C-alpha cells in the first residue's frame, strides 16, 4: 500500500539534503515514520501540530515548509499547489515564488490558495503548506514513488527557497 506519509518523508529527506548542500540549517519535524504527539494527547493530530509549532519557535526558524500530498475523489485532479495564510505577508510572497516555479517546471495549473489552518494561526514564522501532487491521480502516484521525481520536486522547492532569501 502506497501512503502519503512514506512518500512525503522521502521528499522531505531529499529536500533537507539539497538545502543543506546550499548551506541552510535544516530542522526536520520527523526523520522516521512517527508523529510528534505524545501518548497523553487526547487529540493526537492537534498534539502533533502543537509540537511542530513549538519546534518552529524553539529553533527560531526563518521559514517552515509543510510537505504533503493531496488526495481527492476525482482521480483526474493533478498538480502541485501551495497554501498560505494571510497573517504574515511573507507567506504569500514565498508561496507565489514556489507556485510559479511549480507551474514552470511541472506545468501545474493549480493556483496559490489562501487558508486558515490551525498551524498558520498559531505561529509567526513564515511558511507554506506544499501539496506535491495528487496520490489519487494514477500518473502522479506513479511519478511520486520514483526517486528521480522526488528529487525534481525537492529541487523546485530548494530553488524557490534560495530565490526567496535572495530577494
Segments predicted by a language model, with ranges:
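A generic structural signal for alpha->beta connector loops
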Residues: 23-24, 79, 108-109, 124-126
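Charged/polar, solvent-exposed surface patches and flexible loops
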Residues: 51, 100, 142
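Catalytic-core regions of hydrolytic enzymes
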Residues: 1-80, 84-94
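Active-site/binding-pocket entry motifs
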Residues: 35, 104, 135-136
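Sec-exported extracytoplasmic/periplasmic mature domains
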Residues: 13-24, 31, 57-61, 99-108, ...
Amino acid at each position: 500500500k502506497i501512503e502519503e506519509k512514506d512518500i512525503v518523508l522521502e521528499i522531505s529527506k531529499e529536500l533537507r539534503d539539497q538545502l543543506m548542500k546550499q548551506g541552510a540549517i535544516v530542522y526536520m519535524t520527523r526523520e522516521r515514520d512517527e508523529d510528534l504527539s505524545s501518548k497523553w494527547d487526547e487529540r493526537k493530530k492537534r498534539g502533533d501540530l502543537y509540537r511542530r509549532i513549538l519546534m518552529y519557535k524553539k529553533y527560531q526558524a526563518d521559514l517552515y515548509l509543510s510537505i504533503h500530498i493531496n488526495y481527492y475523489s476525482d482521480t483526474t485532479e493533478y498538480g502541485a499547489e501551495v497554501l498560505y495564510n494571510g497573517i504574515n505577508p511573507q507567506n504569500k510572497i514565498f508561496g507565489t515564488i514556489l507556485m510559479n516555479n511549480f507551474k514552470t517546471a511541472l506545468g501545474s495549473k493549480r493556483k496559490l490558495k489562501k487558508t486558515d489552518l490551525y498551524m498558520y494561526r498559531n505561529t509567526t514564522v513564515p511558511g507554506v503548506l506544499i501539496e506535491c501532487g495528487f496520490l489519487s491521480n494514477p500518473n502522479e502516484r506513479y511519478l511520486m514513488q520514483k526517486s528521480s521525481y522526488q528529487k525534481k520536486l525537492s529541487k523546485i522547492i530548494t530553488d524557490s527557497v534560495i530565490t526567496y532569501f535572495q530577494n
